[in-house]
């Protein structure tokens, strides 16, 4: 039995956490190459730019064809207004190319939304998706919530939506994976999952988002990984600015997160977990954690977590200035986007065993 087979079998038997020489050498290889989240192509998805080299993707089939060409294992793409005919065509394309498919879907806000939600779940399933990623907020916590009451209302409404969705998921046997989308802190999301107690609702584990909420990225992984269905793979760059710090997705080999350790933990907890690249090519996000307005939605979060985060930013300052793209031409942005994705795919195969 070779080493790869041995490590994979250890995971399947539930003994993947046994002592091994090092996390870098003991990562558990994936069974398929890393997939691509549609947001990795934020500049190219449904783009109207007249680029000969980087034409826009008008639908999921076009995205899937391209991702197959560059060596990805699958895609995670928005499910919205798919017809039964389109779902069938996407299924045929997926089966021909041998890729996996995951959807990204909105949960129902009211009972009146449930029929549409169920139809989208059915169409997703028909196309071959049995995992659907979702978010339960309209934006980033520190931008859209301005009081503890706002946060409490968000949690209440999110739980109500998920309870509307759960019977549909159970009936259709499709899993829903909630992303830590700069809205839920890890403990809050775990509490919600425990309240729901459904085998059909789990987590889309985003490797870097929760840094924006002053959380230690490895602590977030350790708290959420028992519930992981799918992932948003990314590495992060940080640097200080006047009101806090800047946060940016960077190519997987260039950031400060321990990618091998995170992948290993995910595989230990769910041997069928999928790894989907979310390499968003854009200007850095401003995390204004030194401004009073930022703290309006963080009732009860101790100052020590701010201090820890600032220390982390200082210790892991990006090797040069974080990339800025907004001043560049659309053709340049498309080129950088594609090169970033190709670099990440190469890293995932060579360093993470996702091949």
Predicted feature residues:
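Acidic (Asp/Glu)-rich catalytic clusters
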Residues: 27-30, 64-69, 83-102, 116-129, ...
């Amino acid at each position: 039995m070779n080493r790869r087979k041995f490590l994979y079998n250890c995971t399947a038997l539930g003994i993947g956490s046994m002592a091994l020489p090092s996390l870098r050498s003991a990562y558990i290889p994936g069974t398929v190459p890393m997939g691509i989240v549609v947001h990795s192509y934020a500049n190219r998805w449904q783009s109207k730019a007249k680029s000969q080299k980087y034409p826009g993707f008008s639908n999921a089939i076009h995205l899937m064809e391209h991702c197959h060409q560059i060596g990805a294992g699958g895609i995670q793409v928005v499910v919205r207004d798919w017809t039964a005919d389109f779902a069938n065509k996407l299924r045929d394309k997926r089966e021909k190319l041998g890729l996996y498919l995951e959807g990204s879907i909105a949960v129902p806000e009211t009972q009146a939304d449930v029929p549409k939600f169920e139809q989208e779940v059915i169409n997703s399933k028909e196309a071959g998706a049995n995992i659907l990623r979702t978010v339960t907020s309209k934006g980033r916590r520190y931008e859209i919530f301005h009081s503890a009451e706002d946060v409490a209302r968000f949690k209440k409404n999110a739980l109500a939506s998920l309870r509307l969705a759960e019977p549909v998921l159970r009936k259709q046997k499709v899993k829903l994976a909630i992303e830590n989308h700069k809205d839920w802190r890890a403990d809050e999301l775990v509490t919600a999952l425990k309240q729901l107690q459904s085998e059909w609702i789990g987590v889309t584990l985003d490797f870097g988002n929760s840094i924006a909420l002053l959380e230690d990225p490895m602590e977030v992984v350790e708290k959420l990984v028992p519930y992981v269905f799918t992932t948003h793979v990314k590495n992060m760059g940080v640097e200080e600015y006047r009101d806090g710090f800047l946060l940016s997705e960077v190519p997987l080999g260039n950031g400060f997160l321990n990618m091998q350790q995170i992948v290993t933990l995910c595989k230990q907890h769910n041997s069928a977990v999928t790894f989907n690249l979310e390499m968003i090519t854009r200007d850095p996000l401003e995390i204004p954690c030194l401004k009073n307005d930022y703290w309006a939605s963080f009732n009860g979060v101790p100052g020590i977590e701010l201090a820890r985060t600032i220390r982390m930013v200082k210790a892991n300052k990006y090797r040069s200035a974080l990339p800025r793209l907004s001043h560049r031409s659309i053709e340049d942005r498309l080129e950088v986007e594609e090169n970033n994705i190709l670099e990440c795919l190469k890293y995932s195969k060579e360093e993470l065993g996702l091949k």
